[in-house]
A protein has these predicted regions:
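N-terminal secretory targeting modules
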Residues: 5-8, 24-202, 207-227, 401
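Hydrophobic core
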Residues: 13, 17-18
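Residues at the starts of beta-strands that form the adenosine-phosphate
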Residues: 198, 245, 328-330
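Alpha-helical cap/lid subdomain in secreted, periplasmic
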Residues: 271-401
Length: 401
């Protein structure tokens, strides 16, 4: 009898040591909704939390090719625990609950030896969508999450070195998202280095890419993020072509002075995330952009705006950027063609900062010359064309040293 009881106890103990993972994959170009994960595996007491330290990276390692003969074990990287394994890009922030992942093209990047499934645990109050890059290549699958979910963002065979980047597709207005943890078999190195160039974009739906992947016949209700992919916006495409890091601060309907919201642009984006609290964005310790690109005005004109309102708020934004970062960041002010009066407003604004000699540049371009997506907004082809125009402008003005 004692032997039988002992056998049962041993079986239970052995079973409890196995971690069961739940996730989902998908075919190319399929939108993948997440499955529920065992959140209890992530829960740790404050006493158990300690800083995670990634191993030093061998610069000679090649993603997808360098292999290890080590036996890899399963690990959970808790994002509420400080560590040096993840590179945070844009307005992505570490908190005691996880990584705040609210803004368009917020991103994280990590590298290490991995095998089997790599599962990202996410909590989002509404639909959020993500693009994943593995070893520099964009994965065709679109990943989506709502609630507390787990996403199998990659599956590997063999014990190879890989680099993964996860980028949010939707703007801050649609959902608020926390990255909770990463579960994988293997281990991570120190975070990848920053790219040499960093560009920050300020705008509305034309910059956040609302409607760019929708059908032209669809009215695109403004609470549905499925029509939007900021990783196919002119802003992100431009930075990818330059091998630069990107930050997008943009919201559909917002104006620099008026627009479709009660407040103006700077009221919202001088906060780290206005949907969470009114805590101001802290410039200290933040990465300083090499170029700032502003594209605001469409919503001001759709509801009405005076020259005094527009120019005054535009000056506030430029001063906010330059005084906050303590640097005369070159400003590219993108705009559409709106006639003589508006051109005079822009000339006054440009002259105030000394024009191109003062690092203030005006770029006029169309916004949907190559077709529309949902809600009458530019489709991906139009964003590609805008990106090409912006790249040519940056090269012509020699804005990259």
């Amino acid at each position: 009898m004692k032997k039988k009881i002992l056998s049962i106890i041993c079986f239970i103990l052995a079973s409890s040591m196995l971690l069961f993972t739940v996730g989902c994959g998908g075919e190319a170009n399929e939108t993948v909704e997440a499955t529920d994960t065992q959140a209890q595996t992530e829960k740790k007491t404050k006493k158990e939390k300690k800083t995670e330290t990634g191993k030093k990276t061998d610069m000679n390692m090649t993603p997808g090719q360098t292999k290890t003969d080590e036996t890899l074990t399963e690990r959970i990287y808790d994002f509420s625990v400080p560590n040096n394994c993840f590179r945070l890009i844009g307005r992505t922030k570490s908190t005691g609950s996880g990584l705040i992942f609210d803004h368009a093209v917020s991103a994280i990047e990590f590298q290490g030896f991995m095998t089997g499934d790599v599962i990202l645990n996410v909590t989002s109050n509404k639909e959020s969508y993500f693009t994943v890059y593995v070893d520099g290549e964009r994965v065709d699958t679109r990943f989506g999450a709502s609630g507390s979910k787990g996403l199998t963002i990659a599956s590997f065979e063999g014990n190879y070195f890989h680099v993964i980047r996860i980028v949010r597709q939707n703007e801050v207005a649609w959902s608020q998202c926390l990255l909770r943890s990463l579960k994988m078999t293997g281990y991570l190195f120190e975070a990848p280095e920053e790219r040499d160039l960093y560009i920050e974009f300020y705008g509305d739906s034309l910059t956040s890419a609302f409607g760019n992947i929708g059908d032209p016949s669809d009215p695109a209700p403004h609470d549905v993020p499925k029509y939007q992919d900021a990783t196919q916006s002119y802003a992100f495409l431009t930075t990818e072509a330059l091998n630069a890091d990107c930050s997008i601060l943009a919201m559909s309907g917002v104006g620099i002075a008026t627009g479709h919201y009660e407040k103006h642009f700077l009221h919202y984006f001088s906060q780290f995330c206005h949907k969470r609290s009114n805590a101001k964005f802290e410039f200290e310790g933040a990465r300083v952009p090499d170029i700032a690109v502003v594209r605001l005005g469409a919503n001001d004109f759709s509801v009405g705006c005076t020259k005094e309102q527009y120019v005054s708020r535009a000056k506030e934004l430029v001063d906010y950027i330059r005084e906050g970062y303590k640097k005369d960041v070159p400003i590219i002010w993108m705009h559409g063609s709106r006639g003589g009066d508006f051109n005079n407003w822009l000339k006054e604004l440009s002259d105030y900062y000394g024009g191109e000699a003062g690092g203030f540049y005006l770029l006029e371009l169309g916004w949907r010359d190559h077709g529309v997506g949902a809600g009458g907004h530019p489709n991906v082809a139009s964003h590609v064309a805008n990106s090409e125009s912006l790249l040519a402008f940056i090269a012509d003005k020699k804005l990259i040293k």
